[in-house]
Amino acid sequence: MKKWMLAICLMFINEICHATDCFDLAGRDYKIDPDLLRAISWKESRYRVNAIGINPVTGYGSGLMQVDSQHFNELARYGINPEHLTTDPCMNIYTGAYYLAIAFKKWGITWEAVGAYNAGFRKTERQNQRRLAYASDVYRIYTGIKSSKGIRIPVTKKSLPEINSVQNN
């Protein structure tokens, strides 16, 4: 019994370590602070690789970064299927980083773009409030991650450039 428990624990630890490296790699490749990706993943799934979250409008989100099912047709063109997103942590993290990079390209490196990762780009007051609430939650998680590493974050809710430059220090 103890051997089985040890084997299960080692598999779980291996998966977490593997995913941790992927935050760093995806952050490097998409030029996004890996800790921001970690903060989004914590907000979206509490770091659960196989998480499924119901979205009443578009269907559901999959995996660590809760990649929305509305993107599945596009992802299928690249050979990514829904099962990959709940079984391959790196695939999920890279896919989430890809969609966050799209938001940054569209709206700049702003907290509004972080909010759009979850609430979309529709320009209505309701969506704006949803983006703000989401970005505020991610910001709190992000500053907690940075604080645990002894890094102070400038107080801002508007722009990420100063924060993203922290990763280079």
Swiss-Prot record:
CDD domains: LT_IagB-like
Origin: domain of life: Bacteria
Organism encoding this protein: Escherichia coli
Keyword list, A-Z: Plasmid
Gene: X
Protein name: X polypeptide
Recorded family membership: Belongs to the IagB/IpgF/P19 family.
Presence of the UniProt keyword Cell membrane in the record: no
